[in-house]
Amino acid sequence: PLSSTLAVSYYKYYIMDTVDVAGDKCVDLAFVPVNSQSYGFTGRLYITLDGNYAVKKFLLNTPANINLNWVDKLRIEQEFKRMPDSTWVLANENTYVNFYIVKGAQQLYAHQLRNFDKYQFDVQNADSIFGLLGPIHELPEATAQTDTFWIHNRHVPLKEKESALDDLLAQLRKVPAFNVIIKTAEILITGYIPTTADKDKSKFDFGPMNTTFSANHLEGFRMRVGGMTTANLNPHWFGSGYLAYGVNDRKLKYNAKLTYSVNKKKYHEGESPVNNISAIQEYDVYTPGQDFLFTSKDNMFVAWKVGEPVTMMQYIRKTMLQYQKEWLNGLTLTTWARNENNEAAGTLRYDRYDADGTLTNLKSFTNTELGTQLRFAPGERAYNGREGKNSLFNLSKDAPVFKLSHQMGLKNVLGSDFNYNHTEISAEKRIWLSSFGHIDALVTAGKVWDKVPFPLLIMPNPNQSITIQPQAFNMMRALEFVSDQYVSFYFTYYMK
């Protein structure tokens, strides 16, 4: 409603009255979208009449005919106050939502009240947190406070019904049907099952559950079981991994990871800000070039392939040391040292072209590499999901993301067969188009600077699963294209 370019084309405005809002004389300005089914709002703007024409307060409601997934009604209220230096800041925010799971069934109601106070703009000698560029970051101990602390520090005391909410939730969890729904939702979102009835006391979680059963051409039916320790066992040391077995190849695969977190964690190792040292040992089956960003390769829905069967595969045995450091200004540094043995499997062959023109079949090759990646996302909000910032459930994607990485192969180090240098750079941004939706744009480029065998060249990420995966080519087969340099563009338009 305040857009300087599209507002008057998208909304109709009506002056309703002149009112007093918390001591400020304001004009009550009503607005409605020209099209009642469009993604816009109806509501009121309260504009001060002191010559500054500042927004003192606004009310936003979704139109009656809007199609907004499971949301039936949404109302947002914000009120602002003027500071002594004439800066306007947010004072109160109320959000009301009516939503449903099944159309026509009993609706659910949610209300959130947020109050802001004690703004400080002239902090002297800012410490290492407030002196950085990042926005709001929640430290693990921020929510681990006693009831007494909140009684003395809340700007607005809780009402009696609000204070009883925790007791109500505890009673609801005793209802079997409700508890089953909550547990199922937690498993679907996190992918893990706690080993205690109270998740906050679990020392080990089983998962991810969507990787328990899968299948591929080489292994046939594949079974996998794994999990991870939590901060309830130790807030600095974390272990995770899995065991997997294929019915056809009858080989046991495994992954074991031990992580030391310099920062004390609330529940799992991936909580922001990350400052972790990890050691990884792994032996497993991979498809060349396939690297899904938002899920595991063993996800049962990703493992279900369509089209031409994927028969070219690899057994990879890997030992890796990794250090990852995340600063609150959006900069992340990742460095690693890796030794990897790559064995051809299925219909994949490694043939060496000798000087006399003959081909020699190689069962496997070994490479040792050092690598580093810089990731910079200025203004990015912290996300504490187990899968990290690339998680599908991380909806905070407005900040631009820039990445620069380089990998260097070291011949004759720990049996390595090749020298190589591989550089990649990328830029990603969500572009908002006002009422016309948004575009997720990603541009990447990479180059291998040395002469290397094809498994060490650049392979576009193919996707032959039944699901559409971001940043993957859905019409491409594994190893269909291999190159030593590339530029790729990914643009996804979400229309409204």
Regions picked out by a protein language model, each given a short descriptive name:
Residues 1-10:
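Active-site acidic/histidine clusters and adjacent loop/turn architecture
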Residues 2, 15-18, 78-80, 263-267, ...:
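Intrinsically disordered, low-complexity boundary segments flanking structured domains
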